[in-house]
Amino acid sequence: MKAFLVALLISIELALVFAGCPTIISKNRWGGQQARKVEPTTKPLKYVIINHTSGPSCVDEIDCSRMLVYIQNRHMNHLNYNDIGCNFIIGGDGQIYEGAGWQAAASHTPGWNKKSLLIGFIGDYEINRPSLKQLEAGKQLIECAVERGEIEQDYKLVGARTIRQTNSPGKYLFRELQSWKGFTRDP
């Protein structure tokens, strides 16, 4: 009985600690495959990297799920990644979708995968502006990661273009990131 009460109290405390975390649509729900292999990371991570998919956006869960299945297939079958390349992906609908998740290193930039959390935004933000819903979801996800101990309190936030040759996350999203907590051009 005592062990049950202790477990119950711990569960309640964890629920309160993570109460600020947004809803994350599971990989299973959007139709994703399981990872071929999980490369673990050492927590807390120092970096949060933001990229974009540089393709069309999506407007609802059905549309975003279809795009994620396509992206995951491309990443796993053509780029030989273990999973979809991002830890989490934010759709044009403002919802957060599980990618590789909290426990696995993403597949995006050699030398950075095991020390960063990669958040992707579905869409092309070189030509389009991200929605306010997407931007808020990104900020909430980062706050959640801090609360969970997944990233350091004094994390560094970078656009993918800061660490490799790419236009990602697009000029409009990159411009927005510059006002976010932790943003740096010099990781």
Swiss-Prot record:
It is found in: Secreted. The keyword Secreted applies. GO terms for biological process: innate immune response; peptidoglycan catabolic process. One of its GO terms (molecular function) is zinc ion binding. Residues 1-19 form the signal peptide. Glycans are attached at N51. GO terms for cellular component: extracellular region. Pfam families: Amidase_2 (PF01510). InterPro entries: Amidase/PGRP_sf, Amidase_domain, Peptidoglycan_recognition, PGRP, PGRP_domain_met/bac. SMART domains: Ami_2, PGRP. It comes from the Eukaryota. Residues 43-170 form the N-acetylmuramoyl-L-alanine amidase domain. Disulfide bonds join C21-C144, C58-C64. Its main location: secreted. Keywords: Disulfide bond, Glycoprotein, Immunity, Innate immunity, Secreted, Signal. Belongs to the N-acetylmuramoyl-L-alanine amidase 2 family. Peptidoglycan-recognition protein probably involved in innate immunity by binding to peptidoglycans (PGN) of bacteria and activating the prophenoloxidase (proPO) cascade immune response. Binds to 1,3-beta-D-glucan and PGN. This is Peptidoglycan-recognition protein 3. It comes from Holotrichia diomphalia (Korean black chafer). The lineage of its organism: Eukaryota, Metazoa, Ecdysozoa, Arthropoda, Hexapoda. The gene is PGRP-3.
